[in-house]
Amino acid sequence: VGHIENNESNIFDFIFIGLGASNSLIVLSLIKNGLLKDKKVLFVESSSKSNNDKTYCFWSSQNDSIIDDLSTIISHQFDKIKINNSNVQSLEGLFYYYIRSIDLYNHTFNKLNEEKIVIERAEVTNIIEDQDFCFVLTSSQSFRTRFIFDSRPPRLYKITEKDIYINQSFFGLHIKCENAVFLKDAFEMMNFNVEQNGATQFFYIIPFSSQEALVELTRFGIEKIDFNYASELVKNYILNEFGNYTIIAEETGCIPMTTFENEPSANKRILNTGTAANLIKPSTGYGFKKMYSFAQKVSEQISKNKYDKFNKSNLINKKRFKFYDTLLLIILLKWPLKGKPDRK
Protein backbone atom coordinates (compact mmCIF):
# COMPACT_ATOMS: atom_id res chain seq x y z
CA VAL A 1 0.00 0.00 0.00
CA GLY A 2 1.30 3.45 -0.90
CA HIS A 3 1.87 6.10 1.72
CA ILE A 4 0.44 9.62 1.73
CA GLU A 5 2.95 12.37 1.06
CA ASN A 6 2.46 16.09 1.51
CA ASN A 7 4.99 16.95 -1.15
CA GLU A 8 4.00 20.13 -3.04
CA SER A 9 5.25 18.65 -6.34
CA ASN A 10 2.72 15.84 -5.95
CA ILE A 11 -0.36 18.11 -5.89
CA PHE A 12 -2.44 18.25 -9.10
CA ASP A 13 -5.63 19.85 -10.38
CA PHE A 14 -6.58 16.78 -12.43
CA ILE A 15 -5.39 13.18 -12.35
CA PHE A 16 -6.35 10.80 -15.15
CA ILE A 17 -6.28 7.12 -14.19
CA GLY A 18 -5.68 5.21 -17.41
CA LEU A 19 -4.74 6.38 -20.89
CA GLY A 20 -7.27 4.50 -23.03
CA ALA A 21 -9.69 5.92 -25.58
CA SER A 22 -12.05 7.75 -23.22
CA ASN A 23 -9.43 9.59 -21.16
CA SER A 24 -7.43 10.35 -24.31
CA LEU A 25 -10.48 11.96 -25.94
CA ILE A 26 -11.24 13.96 -22.79
CA VAL A 27 -7.72 15.36 -22.44
CA LEU A 28 -7.54 16.13 -26.19
CA SER A 29 -10.78 18.13 -25.89
CA LEU A 30 -9.54 19.99 -22.79
CA ILE A 31 -6.25 20.84 -24.55
CA LYS A 32 -8.02 21.94 -27.75
CA ASN A 33 -10.25 24.29 -25.76
CA GLY A 34 -7.32 25.73 -23.78
CA LEU A 35 -8.70 24.47 -20.47
CA LEU A 36 -5.42 23.10 -19.10
CA LYS A 37 -3.32 26.26 -19.53
CA ASP A 38 -3.22 27.03 -15.80
CA LYS A 39 -3.77 23.46 -14.59
CA LYS A 40 -1.36 20.87 -13.25
CA VAL A 41 -2.24 17.48 -14.73
CA LEU A 42 -0.99 13.92 -14.24
CA PHE A 43 -1.73 10.63 -16.00
CA VAL A 44 -1.26 7.37 -14.09
CA GLU A 45 -0.98 4.45 -16.52
CA SER A 46 0.82 1.15 -15.97
CA SER A 47 0.95 0.15 -19.67
CA SER A 48 3.44 1.65 -22.13
CA LYS A 49 0.63 1.95 -24.72
CA SER A 50 3.24 1.17 -27.38
CA ASN A 51 1.29 -1.59 -29.15
CA ASN A 52 -1.63 -1.45 -31.54
CA ASP A 53 -3.84 -3.40 -29.12
CA LYS A 54 -7.27 -2.28 -30.36
CA THR A 55 -9.11 -0.79 -33.28
CA TYR A 56 -11.81 1.86 -32.98
CA CYS A 57 -14.59 2.05 -35.57
CA PHE A 58 -17.53 4.42 -35.68
CA TRP A 59 -20.29 5.70 -37.97
CA SER A 60 -20.43 9.39 -38.82
CA SER A 61 -21.17 11.96 -41.49
CA GLN A 62 -18.18 13.81 -42.96
CA ASN A 63 -19.14 17.17 -41.44
CA ASP A 64 -19.26 15.91 -37.84
CA SER A 65 -16.79 17.59 -35.45
CA ILE A 66 -15.24 14.21 -34.59
CA ILE A 67 -13.88 14.05 -38.16
CA ASP A 68 -12.29 17.51 -37.89
CA ASP A 69 -10.75 16.69 -34.53
CA LEU A 70 -9.38 13.25 -35.42
CA SER A 71 -8.79 13.46 -39.19
CA THR A 72 -5.01 13.04 -38.77
CA ILE A 73 -5.43 9.61 -37.15
CA ILE A 74 -8.31 8.17 -39.21
CA SER A 75 -6.52 5.60 -41.35
CA HIS A 76 -9.46 4.25 -43.37
CA GLN A 77 -13.00 5.26 -44.23
CA PHE A 78 -15.72 3.40 -46.08
CA ASP A 79 -18.86 4.59 -47.86
CA LYS A 80 -20.05 1.11 -48.86
CA ILE A 81 -21.06 -1.98 -46.89
CA LYS A 82 -21.70 -5.66 -47.51
CA ILE A 83 -23.91 -7.50 -44.99
CA ASN A 84 -24.12 -11.30 -44.77
CA ASN A 85 -23.02 -12.00 -48.36
CA SER A 86 -25.52 -9.51 -49.82
CA ASN A 87 -24.65 -7.12 -52.63
CA VAL A 88 -22.48 -4.11 -51.85
CA GLN A 89 -24.65 -1.18 -50.74
CA SER A 90 -23.96 2.53 -50.42
CA LEU A 91 -24.07 4.05 -46.92
CA GLU A 92 -25.78 7.10 -48.51
CA GLY A 93 -23.97 9.99 -46.88
CA LEU A 94 -22.77 8.07 -43.85
CA PHE A 95 -19.20 6.81 -43.49
CA TYR A 96 -17.63 4.07 -41.41
CA TYR A 97 -14.31 5.21 -39.94
CA TYR A 98 -11.37 3.14 -38.71
CA ILE A 99 -8.72 4.26 -36.20
CA ARG A 100 -5.80 2.19 -34.92
CA SER A 101 -5.38 2.51 -31.15
CA ILE A 102 -1.62 3.09 -31.49
CA ASP A 103 -2.34 6.19 -33.62
CA LEU A 104 -4.69 7.57 -30.95
CA TYR A 105 -2.13 6.85 -28.19
CA ASN A 106 0.72 8.50 -30.12
CA HIS A 107 -1.43 11.50 -31.02
CA THR A 108 -2.33 11.89 -27.33
CA PHE A 109 1.32 11.45 -26.23
CA ASN A 110 2.37 14.23 -28.63
CA LYS A 111 -0.26 16.60 -27.23
CA LEU A 112 0.69 15.70 -23.63
CA ASN A 113 4.35 16.41 -24.42
CA GLU A 114 3.44 19.80 -25.91
CA GLU A 115 1.54 20.63 -22.71
CA LYS A 116 4.33 19.16 -20.53
CA ILE A 117 1.86 16.77 -18.90
CA VAL A 118 3.61 13.96 -17.05
CA ILE A 119 2.74 10.25 -17.25
CA GLU A 120 3.43 8.19 -14.13
CA ARG A 121 4.02 4.57 -15.17
CA ALA A 122 2.35 2.81 -12.27
CA GLU A 123 -0.80 1.03 -11.22
CA VAL A 124 -3.25 2.73 -8.87
CA THR A 125 -3.60 0.69 -5.67
CA ASN A 126 -6.08 2.90 -3.84
CA ILE A 127 -7.90 6.22 -3.75
CA ILE A 128 -8.31 7.91 -0.37
CA GLU A 129 -10.88 10.66 0.00
CA ASP A 130 -10.41 13.84 1.97
CA GLN A 131 -12.80 16.77 2.32
CA ASP A 132 -10.97 18.99 -0.16
CA PHE A 133 -8.79 16.52 -2.06
CA CYS A 134 -8.37 12.92 -3.16
CA PHE A 135 -5.15 10.97 -2.74
CA VAL A 136 -4.24 8.60 -5.57
CA LEU A 137 -1.93 5.89 -4.28
CA THR A 138 0.45 3.68 -6.24
CA SER A 139 2.76 1.03 -4.76
CA SER A 140 5.55 3.58 -4.32
CA GLN A 141 3.99 7.03 -3.82
CA SER A 142 0.86 9.14 -3.59
CA PHE A 143 -0.50 12.15 -5.45
CA ARG A 144 -2.99 14.71 -4.22
CA THR A 145 -5.60 16.08 -6.60
CA ARG A 146 -8.81 18.06 -6.75
CA PHE A 147 -10.44 15.91 -9.43
CA ILE A 148 -9.98 12.43 -10.90
CA PHE A 149 -10.95 10.95 -14.29
CA ASP A 150 -11.14 7.24 -13.51
CA SER A 151 -11.27 4.87 -16.50
CA ARG A 152 -10.77 1.63 -14.57
CA PRO A 153 -13.46 -0.89 -15.61
CA PRO A 154 -16.49 -1.23 -13.32
CA ARG A 155 -16.65 -4.09 -10.87
CA LEU A 156 -19.16 -6.29 -12.62
CA TYR A 157 -19.93 -8.34 -9.53
CA LYS A 158 -22.50 -5.65 -8.70
CA ILE A 159 -24.73 -7.04 -11.48
CA THR A 160 -28.14 -8.10 -10.20
CA GLU A 161 -30.31 -10.99 -11.39
CA LYS A 162 -32.33 -8.50 -13.43
CA ASP A 163 -29.31 -7.56 -15.53
CA ILE A 164 -28.24 -9.32 -18.70
CA TYR A 165 -24.54 -9.84 -19.36
CA ILE A 166 -22.96 -11.51 -22.36
CA ASN A 167 -19.55 -11.19 -23.97
CA GLN A 168 -18.63 -9.89 -27.39
CA SER A 169 -15.33 -11.68 -27.89
CA PHE A 170 -13.32 -11.73 -31.08
CA PHE A 171 -10.22 -13.07 -32.80
CA GLY A 172 -8.88 -11.38 -35.92
CA LEU A 173 -5.95 -11.60 -38.32
CA HIS A 174 -4.48 -8.68 -40.21
CA ILE A 175 -3.43 -10.40 -43.44
CA LYS A 176 -1.88 -9.75 -46.84
CA CYS A 177 -3.15 -11.95 -49.67
CA GLU A 178 -1.20 -12.96 -52.78
CA ASN A 179 -4.02 -11.73 -55.01
CA ALA A 180 -6.16 -8.58 -55.15
CA VAL A 181 -9.30 -9.98 -53.48
CA PHE A 182 -10.79 -7.10 -51.45
CA LEU A 183 -12.98 -4.14 -52.42
CA LYS A 184 -11.11 -1.14 -51.01
CA ASP A 185 -14.11 1.09 -50.23
CA ALA A 186 -16.51 -1.56 -48.85
CA PHE A 187 -16.29 -3.31 -45.49
CA GLU A 188 -18.21 -6.45 -44.60
CA MET A 189 -20.04 -7.23 -41.39
CA MET A 190 -22.40 -9.89 -40.04
CA ASN A 191 -21.17 -12.56 -42.46
CA PHE A 192 -22.79 -15.64 -40.90
CA ASN A 193 -21.03 -18.12 -43.17
CA VAL A 194 -19.62 -19.91 -40.10
CA GLU A 195 -20.79 -22.48 -37.54
CA GLN A 196 -22.66 -20.85 -34.63
CA ASN A 197 -21.32 -23.12 -31.84
CA GLY A 198 -24.19 -22.46 -29.40
CA ALA A 199 -23.94 -18.67 -29.71
CA THR A 200 -24.12 -15.99 -32.43
CA GLN A 201 -20.94 -15.95 -34.53
CA PHE A 202 -20.01 -14.03 -37.67
CA PHE A 203 -17.09 -12.74 -39.73
CA TYR A 204 -16.22 -9.06 -40.01
CA ILE A 205 -13.82 -7.82 -42.71
CA ILE A 206 -12.12 -4.42 -42.87
CA PRO A 207 -10.07 -4.00 -46.09
CA PHE A 208 -6.95 -1.81 -46.00
CA SER A 209 -6.14 -2.30 -49.70
CA SER A 210 -7.13 -4.74 -52.45
CA GLN A 211 -4.72 -7.29 -50.92
CA GLU A 212 -4.70 -6.41 -47.22
CA ALA A 213 -7.46 -6.68 -44.59
CA LEU A 214 -8.47 -7.44 -41.03
CA VAL A 215 -10.55 -10.63 -41.00
CA GLU A 216 -12.22 -11.14 -37.64
CA LEU A 217 -14.47 -13.78 -36.09
CA THR A 218 -16.86 -12.25 -33.54
CA ARG A 219 -18.91 -14.17 -30.99
CA PHE A 220 -21.89 -12.89 -28.97
CA GLY A 221 -22.38 -15.30 -26.08
CA ILE A 222 -22.03 -15.99 -22.37
CA GLU A 223 -18.87 -18.01 -23.00
CA LYS A 224 -15.95 -16.16 -24.58
CA ILE A 225 -14.55 -17.43 -27.84
CA ASP A 226 -11.73 -19.96 -27.58
CA PHE A 227 -8.79 -18.38 -29.42
CA ASN A 228 -7.31 -21.67 -30.66
CA TYR A 229 -10.71 -22.67 -32.05
CA ALA A 230 -11.22 -19.20 -33.56
CA SER A 231 -7.74 -19.14 -35.09
CA GLU A 232 -8.41 -22.37 -36.98
CA LEU A 233 -11.81 -21.15 -38.23
CA VAL A 234 -10.43 -17.79 -39.38
CA LYS A 235 -7.42 -19.33 -41.14
CA ASN A 236 -9.57 -21.89 -42.97
CA TYR A 237 -12.08 -19.20 -43.96
CA ILE A 238 -9.35 -16.93 -45.37
CA LEU A 239 -7.75 -19.77 -47.31
CA ASN A 240 -11.08 -20.89 -48.80
CA GLU A 241 -12.35 -17.38 -49.62
CA PHE A 242 -9.19 -15.46 -50.53
CA GLY A 243 -6.41 -17.96 -51.24
CA ASN A 244 -2.83 -17.83 -49.99
CA TYR A 245 -1.91 -15.14 -47.48
CA THR A 246 0.63 -14.05 -44.88
CA ILE A 247 -0.21 -12.91 -41.35
CA ILE A 248 0.87 -9.38 -40.40
CA ALA A 249 -0.71 -9.16 -36.93
CA GLU A 250 -3.25 -10.77 -34.63
CA GLU A 251 -6.04 -9.00 -32.76
CA THR A 252 -8.07 -10.36 -29.85
CA GLY A 253 -10.43 -8.78 -27.35
CA CYS A 254 -13.63 -8.88 -25.38
CA ILE A 255 -16.28 -6.19 -24.92
CA PRO A 256 -19.05 -6.44 -22.29
CA MET A 257 -22.61 -6.34 -23.64
CA THR A 258 -24.79 -5.66 -20.64
CA THR A 259 -27.90 -3.89 -19.40
CA PHE A 260 -26.02 -3.22 -16.14
CA GLU A 261 -25.52 0.51 -15.56
CA ASN A 262 -22.63 1.55 -13.39
CA GLU A 263 -23.54 4.17 -10.79
CA PRO A 264 -21.62 7.47 -10.71
CA SER A 265 -18.85 7.59 -8.14
CA ALA A 266 -20.14 8.45 -4.66
CA ASN A 267 -17.25 10.89 -4.40
CA LYS A 268 -18.07 14.22 -6.05
CA ARG A 269 -14.41 14.59 -7.08
CA ILE A 270 -14.23 11.36 -9.12
CA LEU A 271 -15.69 11.04 -12.63
CA ASN A 272 -16.00 7.55 -14.09
CA THR A 273 -15.02 7.44 -17.77
CA GLY A 274 -15.02 4.82 -20.54
CA THR A 275 -16.80 1.55 -19.83
CA ALA A 276 -17.38 2.65 -16.23
CA ALA A 277 -19.40 5.63 -17.54
CA ASN A 278 -21.77 3.32 -19.48
CA LEU A 279 -20.40 4.54 -22.81
CA ILE A 280 -20.47 1.14 -24.55
CA LYS A 281 -23.74 0.52 -26.43
CA PRO A 282 -25.09 -2.71 -24.86
CA SER A 283 -26.38 -4.37 -28.03
CA THR A 284 -23.44 -3.64 -30.35
CA GLY A 285 -20.31 -3.00 -28.29
CA TYR A 286 -19.68 0.30 -30.11
CA GLY A 287 -18.43 3.07 -27.82
CA PHE A 288 -15.87 5.34 -29.50
CA LYS A 289 -18.29 7.96 -30.85
CA LYS A 290 -20.10 8.06 -27.50
CA MET A 291 -16.78 8.53 -25.72
CA TYR A 292 -16.08 11.47 -28.02
CA SER A 293 -19.48 13.06 -27.25
CA PHE A 294 -18.89 12.48 -23.54
CA ALA A 295 -15.49 14.20 -23.81
CA GLN A 296 -17.12 17.27 -25.40
CA LYS A 297 -19.72 17.43 -22.61
CA VAL A 298 -17.09 17.14 -19.86
CA SER A 299 -14.98 19.80 -21.57
CA GLU A 300 -17.97 22.14 -21.81
CA GLN A 301 -18.77 21.74 -18.10
CA ILE A 302 -15.17 22.43 -17.10
CA SER A 303 -15.12 25.51 -19.35
CA LYS A 304 -18.07 26.82 -17.30
CA ASN A 305 -16.37 25.89 -14.00
CA LYS A 306 -19.24 23.51 -13.22
CA TYR A 307 -17.62 21.22 -10.68
CA ASP A 308 -20.50 20.84 -8.22
CA LYS A 309 -21.79 17.73 -10.03
CA PHE A 310 -18.47 16.70 -11.59
CA ASN A 311 -19.01 13.01 -10.74
CA LYS A 312 -22.46 12.99 -12.37
CA SER A 313 -21.48 14.17 -15.86
CA ASN A 314 -23.11 11.72 -18.24
CA LEU A 315 -24.89 11.28 -21.53
CA ILE A 316 -28.62 10.72 -21.27
CA ASN A 317 -29.60 7.41 -22.87
CA LYS A 318 -33.05 7.50 -24.49
CA LYS A 319 -35.43 5.00 -22.90
CA ARG A 320 -36.52 3.78 -26.33
CA PHE A 321 -32.95 2.74 -27.24
CA LYS A 322 -32.46 1.19 -23.83
CA PHE A 323 -35.53 -0.96 -24.50
CA TYR A 324 -34.21 -2.02 -27.93
CA ASP A 325 -30.81 -2.89 -26.44
CA THR A 326 -32.42 -4.98 -23.70
CA LEU A 327 -34.66 -6.78 -26.20
CA LEU A 328 -31.74 -7.72 -28.45
CA LEU A 329 -29.63 -8.92 -25.51
CA ILE A 330 -32.52 -11.10 -24.26
CA ILE A 331 -32.72 -12.72 -27.72
CA LEU A 332 -28.94 -13.28 -27.84
CA LEU A 333 -29.01 -14.75 -24.33
CA LYS A 334 -32.10 -16.97 -24.56
CA TRP A 335 -32.15 -17.85 -28.26
CA PRO A 336 -28.59 -17.30 -29.56
CA LEU A 337 -29.28 -18.98 -32.91
CA LYS A 338 -31.92 -16.28 -33.59
CA GLY A 339 -29.03 -13.82 -33.83
CA LYS A 340 -28.35 -15.33 -37.25
CA PRO A 341 -30.93 -14.40 -39.93
CA ASP A 342 -32.78 -17.23 -41.69
CA ARG A 343 -31.82 -17.90 -45.29
CA LYS A 344 -34.60 -17.01 -47.72
Where are these regions (language model features)?
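Conserved acidic residues
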Residues: F12-D13, R146, I270
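FAD/FMN-dependent oxidoreductases across multiple families
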Residues: E195, G221-Q301
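Predominantly flavin-linked oxidoreductase catalytic cores and closely associated redox partners
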Residues: L19, N33, E115-Y245, T258-E261
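N-terminal Rossmann-like FAD-binding beta1-loop-alpha1 element of flavoenzymes
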Residues: G2-F43
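N-terminal FAD cofactor-binding segment of flavoenzymes
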Residues: S29-S86
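Short, well-ordered alpha-helices that flank and scaffold nucleotide-derived cofactor binding pockets
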Residues: L28, K32, N110, P207, ...
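A conserved beta-strand/loop capping segment in the N-terminal third of enzymes
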Residues: S61-A122, I127-D130
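C-terminal helical "tail/cap" subdomain of flavin- and related membrane-associated enzymes
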Residues: Q296-K344
